[in-house]
Amino acid sequence: MSVSSFNRRWAAVILEALTRHGVRHVCIAPGSRSTPLTLAAAENRAFIHHTHFDERGLGHLALGLAKVSKAPVAVIVTSGTAVANLYPALIEAGLTGEKLVLLTADRPPELIDCGANQAIRQPGIFASHPAEALSLPRPTQDIPASWLVSTLDHAMGTLRHGALHINCPFAEPLYGELNDTGVEWQQTLGDWWQSDKPWLRAQTHLQSGQQRDWFHWRQKRGVILAGRMTAAEGKQVAEWAKTLGWPLIGDVLSQTGQPLPCADLWLGNAKAVTELARAQIVIQLGSSLTGKRVLQWQSTCEPEEYWLVDSLEGRLDPAHHRGRRLVSTIGDWLEDHPAEKRQAWATDIPELSRLAWDLTTQQCERFGEAELAHRIRQYLPDQGQLFVGNSLVVRLIDALSKLPAGYPVYSNRGASGIDGLISTAAGVQRASTKPTLAIVGDLSALYDLNALALLRQASAPFVLIVVNNNGGQIFSLLPTPQSERERFYLMPQNVQFEHAAAMFSLKYHRPQSWSELDDAMSTAWRQPGATLIELVVNDSDGAQKLQHLLAQVSHL
């Protein structure tokens, strides 16, 4: 028997089984032990292949692909620390719901814990973070092919959200010509090879059902909190809230158009808190709220009823409100809970929001970080999308901007790490093929610098704005010890990104005024490929501007 040949037959069944569950994108890192999986993926015409030399970035690339495609994305890596590098993306997927299928090649059992090279204990390496985990045996014809496909089908069929880790040991030899070894074993699956259906089909049901007392509650005074959702859902929610006459507090990821902009500013005003305290019901649609004042209000509000609707299962309310946790897609839930036309009840809130917006506009004239966040709408590409980084960037955009309703916005706001942001944005662009604007801070860019290699393959104009405020200025908003802040929190690196862009053959601009930024953006959207635009700003101006506006709005 040819071991290398049967390894490939076994791997071919694995990859083919995944196609029956909607896997179309496969992300592959170089490696020897993963050869059977890599060759099987390469030979399967159902797949779109993506490659990257860094497994951590590869995992985030897959995450971005899954965000847009709404389908599971497979990742193939070799054994050893290559596997561990997938951990950050896996954790994020578990919190935000994207489906990742991690195919990790492994040494066979006899090479574990005996000093063999590149051999670590891979089963269970991700602890409780995967939604599902499989540790396959080494390939053998003693195990029916039907067992292999049914095992994979069961795991994929029960995967509602998050990652599936499939550990795949392969013995050597890994290379050699493909011969007839294992053909009969594969053929026992019969006409499964010609079909497009799983061997074992699972029925899944996701629907909370209509709340029977909705017709009662929709006549009450309500508030809508909009968290992370799709662009289409964001437009629906905005119309639904308008019909009900309820104030809508929209997060930057809600894509609702934020009809009451600057919520994270005006919620610091006592008048707003007093007005909203009259609410009898709060309905939160989507999780992962960003703004600090929004989260503070969410945690302290005391309505008669608090409903939280999200397709993700589990507890998603860190304030632990008494109420209802409803598992459903937001679109389906809105369809089951129609709005009734009513007059707006919180009449002071729109005026506070308008005053906060006007004040922000008046004070965001100079060239800077907070000012860019306020103006970001004018730099969005037509028929495009926005990817927002973490730390200070997302907070400024959430607090100071007003994005178009239904305009696609993506981010990694599950674990909210600064690792893998550029890689994720690259995946978002590849899956959508749309023009893409991504904005991150300088430390985030440094953390994922080799992901600039992925941007060379952008299929539409891609603009990466790096806001260089020389360190982690988010800590300027926190009561960190002044004497230790720079050394242990901000950690300024005093770098510029011109040579990084050149190393990866990306176009580069460093504008120093609004007119120069306008010209750079206009040029970038007219050209194919990726452009890195670096905004060098005064270190703490963005954080200070936010604090200044908060103080002013609180006294309106």
From Swiss-Prot:
Gene3D superfamilies: 3.40.50.970, TPP-binding domain
Protein name, per record: 2-succinyl-5-enolpyruvyl-6-hydroxy-3-cyclohexene-1-carboxylate synthase
The keyword Cytoplasm appears for this protein: no
InterPro entries on file: MenaQ_synth_MenD (IPR004433), MenD_middle (IPR032264), THDP-binding (IPR029061), Thiamin_PyroP_enz_TPP-bd_dom (IPR012001), TPP_enzyme_TPP-bd (IPR011766)
GO molecular function terms attached to this record: 2-succinyl-5-enolpyruvyl-6-hydroxy-3-cyclohexene-1-carboxylic-acid synthase activity; magnesium ion binding; manganese ion binding; thiamine pyrophosphate binding
Domain of life: Bacteria
Any one biological process term the GO annotation gives: menaquinone biosynthetic process
Required cofactor names: Mg(2+); Mn(2+); thiamine diphosphate
Catalytic activity as recorded in UniProt: isochorismate + 2-oxoglutarate + H(+) = 5-enolpyruvoyl-6-hydroxy-2-succinyl-cyclohex-3-ene-1-carboxylate + CO2
UniProt organism field: Enterobacter sp. (strain 638)
Keyword Repeat part of the UniProt annotation: no
Designated gene of the protein: menD
Cofactor, free-text remark: Binds 1 thiamine pyrophosphate per subunit.
Family affiliation: Belongs to the TPP enzyme family. MenD subfamily.
Its EC number(s): 2.2.1.9
Functional summary from the UniProt entry: Catalyzes the thiamine diphosphate-dependent decarboxylation of 2-oxoglutarate and the subsequent addition of the resulting succinic semialdehyde-thiamine pyrophosphate anion to isochorismate to yield 2-succinyl-5-enolpyruvyl-6-hydroxy-3-cyclohexene-1-carboxylate (SEPHCHC).
Quaternary structure annotation from Swiss-Prot or TrEMBL: Homodimer.
Pfam family for this entry, one: TPP_enzyme_C
Enzyme class: transferase
Keyword terms: Magnesium, Manganese, Menaquinone biosynthesis, Metal-binding, Thiamine pyrophosphate, Transferase
Pathway listed: Quinol/quinone metabolism; 1,4-dihydroxy-2-naphthoate biosynthesis; 1,4-dihydroxy-2-naphthoate from chorismate: step 2/7; Quinol/quinone metabolism; menaquinone biosynthesis
